[in-house]
Amino acid sequence: MSATPSLWNGKGLSIVCIPFTSFTPDGLEVRLDGVAAQAEFCVAAGNDVALLQGTTGEWPSLSLQERIDLAKEWRRCIPLGHAMKLILHIGHDALVDAITLARIAAVRRNAPDWPALAHRGAPPVLTPAMVVPP
């Protein structure tokens, strides 16, 4: 069976790491000090991609600032020049916050791109621009 070339590495199937977010024992604060060990593990295991805050279900529990801090810490912890791509989950109930996260996702550091995954866990938001005829 031949693998379809991956969007990420162009050679074959990518290995995607879906890390959990570490919290303090009381569950009230995010622990950024665990990100470096997670990133090191994912890199050493040969992962091509890390999907942040997207699939393990913790994103609705995080404040906007916590999500930004986590994204920046992950980006900081991937070794400069390493090929691992990061996908940032940008879904949010507030449109302005989703835009803020999308802007964070657009910042590039050690890879040609930092894709953003948009996902909404709540009903869609309608803005006046969407319902007022041109």
Name what the model sees in each region.
Residues 2-134:
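Active-site beta->alpha loop and helix N-cap motifs at the rims of alpha/beta catalytic domains
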